[in-house]
């Protein structure tokens, strides 16, 4: 997991090093369309030169991956008082059926192996 995070960070840094406003497909209008509300979090060509690449990378990542509703710290999360969704039950049943199918497949394979060993042993 740490390796994946490092690889992602490295890719982001390499992309940032290659990012040029005139050559990229990204535009400030696209940032406004994505819903970045805070003007401090908007990327601009001069950001790379003021305060280094780290700040620019953080700003770019904040625009590209906006904060999701479920990403608040544990203290800020709302409690879920409503009953579980029907899709939860569906996935639970699907998981149970897959386990049963796997068990049945293992039984059949064991029976086939027993028959083969019995015939070889004779």
Swiss-Prot record:
Keyword hit for GTP-binding: no
Residue numbers bearing the Valine amide modification: 120
Keywords: Amidation, Cleavage on pair of basic residues, Hearing, Hormone, Secreted, Signal
Keyword Signal in annotation: yes
Tissue specificity of this protein: In the organ of Corti, detected in the inner hair cell region (at protein level). Expressed in skin (at protein level).
Propeptide residue span(s): 26-80
Signal peptide limits: 1-25
Main location: secreted
Gene Ontology BP, a term: social behavior
Disruption phenotype: Increased anxiety-like behavior, reduced Crhr2 mRNA levels in the lateral septum, normal basal feeding behavior, and hearing impairment at the level of the inner ear with shorter outer hair cells, higher threshold for auditory stimuli and higher distortion product otoacoustic emissions.
Gene Ontology CC, one term: extracellular region
Subcellular location: Secreted
Superkingdom of origin organism: Eukaryota
One GO MF term attached to the UniProt entry: corticotropin-releasing hormone receptor 1 binding
Record-linked Pfam families: CRF (PF00473)
Function: Acts in vitro to stimulate the secretion of adrenocorticotropic hormone (ACTH). Binds with high affinity to CRF receptor types 1, 2-alpha, and 2-beta. Plays a role in the establishment of normal hearing thresholds. Reduces food intake and regulates ghrelin levels in gastric body and plasma.
Family to which this protein belongs: Belongs to the sauvagine/corticotropin-releasing factor/urotensin I family.
Quaternary structure and partners: Interacts with CRHR1 and CRHR2 (via their N-terminal extracellular domain).
Protein name: Urocortin
Organism for this UniProt entry: Mus musculus
GN (gene name): Ucn
């Amino acid at each position: 997991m740490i390796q994946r995070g490092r690889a992602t960070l490295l890719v982001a840094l390499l992309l940032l090093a290659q990012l040029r406003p005139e050559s990229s497909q990204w535009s400030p209008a696209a940032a406004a369309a994505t819903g970045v509300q805070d003007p401090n979090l908007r990327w601009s060509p001069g950001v790379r030169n003021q305060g280094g690449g780290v700040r620019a990378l953080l700003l770019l990542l904040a625009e590209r991956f906006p904060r999701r509703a479920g990403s608040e710290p544990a203290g800020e999360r709302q409690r879920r008082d409503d009953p579980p969704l029907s899709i939860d039950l569906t996935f639970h049943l699907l998981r149970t059926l897959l386990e049963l199918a796997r068990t049945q497949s293992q039984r059949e394979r064991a029976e086939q192996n027993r028959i083969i060993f019995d015939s070889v042993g004779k």
